[in-house]
Amino acid sequence: MNTNVNKLNEVTSISNRAMKFRLSRGGTKRRVRDRDAEAVVKQQLGDEGQIVSRQLFKDKNNLVNQYQNKANEMYTYHVRSTLPFGDDASRVLPNTSYFTYTQKMQDFISELAIMRNRILTDWSKLVQDDINLRNADLAAQGKPQSAQTSDYPTLAQMENTLYVSWFPEPISTVNDFRFSLEPEMLEI
């Protein structure tokens, strides 16, 4: 009787029917603190708690925005295709969806890698174009042109923040040394 139960447990074990995947991704900061505007607001309103920030990379066609949108699209696909598993951000994928899911995720990762390389190659031009756009917007509003290079992350910072880490993990089973059950539980 006990061998039949063991065989049934082997067949119905979640480790035979699903896989765990973990995804983490980085992005770039797209807002900068505007200390000049903060000083004016604090002086006029008398509120020392005010923080004013300005949007970076306002142009929706900017490669940085495209990268962020693609990373968000990948994350949304990952969440919709998998189920939550535990508190460590792992997600469970049914084995029947494995090939479709992994192919789509690999496509996303390849696209993001190409975009990342383009961003890093053209970083100084992307920053300068955005500075010009922000300063033109400020000038059109009659405000001083305060956008500057120091508002943006450096190339080295960008290299560290634009990443995708995606990998499968085994699902723990009764035989896994990291997972133990009391002998009484094994008999149930």
Located regions from the model:
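An N-terminal, globular interaction/scaffold subdomain
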Residues: M1-I119
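Long amphipathic alpha-helical segments with strong coiled-coil/leucine-zipper propensity
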Residues: A89, L93-E187
